[in-house]
């Protein structure tokens, strides 16, 4: 009986190993490229949001920054869990909507209304870039990728509307 059990467990383990090594095929090269680019893109949005939490007293901007951070952190973890996705070794400043190091530095130095203006304008640009990236995989055959891209597009379009409203306030 122990031998039968051992054979069953071994077979299950081996089939599990085979499934995990072939799970790479669940994600196309476009899906992987999307995740590997969106991870540093989201990381920069979180960095910008963390700067906002320190550099503004505007309750609307504070709330927006926290919402961005809360939404994008789990999305990063989800994309990192996809088979075949490798950690990025660059800051991604050449991707759509990414702020340059000098723009991030300027954001760090700004306070008050000047900060709010730079943050909102920069985050709108950042979100527009993320939407462009996400639109490239909306038709992915992988449901996780298609669902995440749709979520990113919808959430960031709503946040752009909110940021434009904040910019129009006196």
Residue ranges and their predicted role:
Residues 13-16:
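C-terminal motif of bacterial Sec signal peptides marking the signal peptidase cleavage site
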Residues 1-7:
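Bacterial N-terminal signal peptides that target proteins for export
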Residues 5, 18-170:
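All-alpha RGS (Regulator of G-protein Signaling) helical domain and cognate RGS-like helical scaffolds
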